[in-house]
């Protein structure tokens, strides 16, 4: 009789090491080295020694987490958030803000030096480390056991939600809504069929967008309207389409003397204070004169375009999202700016035949998405502006696109790290390029 042998399941033994961190990467992970291998340890600061367990091991690097902290860095601080370490929203509240900014700035400098050969120490633009976030999107889950709606962010490395009691990175006016909103949503008849919730703090007050999976009953709409009136909220509802305003005023914010109206689904910078500084620094770097023509690529709804139009002879804005182009046109008209023109064009395609592409420009600003702007960089060189300001939410694509400008006769003269998202690993940046022919 044949006998079959089934081997027992192998149990992988995770390595436990004692290491000392020497650095902090841009994502807030401690960097240590063990037998020639680089270790990235979440929760460990430079100078700290800890017992760590490896969660992932590759040939040249490994990742791990702290199981026991042996020594403490003077730059370790107590997180202000009661959910720190569990919530996936912030990763660096245990690190002093100066250390966070230093690590991000150094990471940007190293990357740009390695990829472009230009070594420039970035200036840092930052605001308050807490209370800065004027926009947030929250998941909603119905808890059968408690019969309540859980409102929160995802847990780190999980799809489960953290039931938020507080969120100190939110603007205080938004943070104050968290607990009352949980009560309101838990009392709705549709509480089992809610999608997600967005909160935005406009200059004229907070707004809420509730996305629901089924049509709301009249009683639920009345309950939400009563809550919005009591809290001074503009209320939008969405069943999958564009949000519909049920109550309150359309939102806007002001930037450099211009009022920008926006729709809830429009992109706006999360950090109002850093956005204002960023726009001001970009204008200073471009040094726009009254007789100059300026091009704003990936212009959105006019965050840079309208301030530029107050300085220049003429400004052209190009954007790929039609709704943002319409909003930008309305904003220019409402601000009495007749020297600005907007084009709806796909900047990821060949731009040479697009309507704006044959015009001449003295200065150019671009603010692309994470993928960067490979489709327009060669054309920017052909347009031969005297200065180019590149605003980036991804330093890797900034470094890549910079090479086209450097090879085309431009010099990288200024670099800036924008701490748009304190306590997270997100790094935003801005660079100034000047024509070597000047």
From Swiss-Prot:
EC number: 2.1.1.190
Domain of life: Bacteria
CDD domains reported in the protein's UniProt record: AdoMet_MTases
Active site: 393 (nucleophile)
Catalytic function, reaction form: uridine(1939) in 23S rRNA + S-adenosyl-L-methionine = 5-methyluridine(1939) in 23S rRNA + S-adenosyl-L-homocysteine + H(+)
Enzyme class: transferase
Pfam families the UniProt entry points to: TRAM, tRNA_U5-meth_tr
InterPro entries found in the cross-reference section: 23S_rRNA_MeTrfase_RlmD, MeTrfase_TrmA_AS, MeTrfase_TrmA_CS, NA-bd_OB-fold, SAM-dependent_MTases_sf, TRAM_dom, U5_MeTrfase_fam
Entry similarity comment: Belongs to the class I-like SAM-binding methyltransferase superfamily. RNA M5U methyltransferase family. RlmD subfamily.
Name the UniProt record assigns to this protein: 23S rRNA (uracil(1939)-C(5))-methyltransferase RlmD
UniProt organism field: Edwardsiella ictaluri (strain 93-146)
The organism's taxonomic lineage, starting at the top: Bacteria, Pseudomonadati, Pseudomonadota, Gammaproteobacteria, Enterobacterales
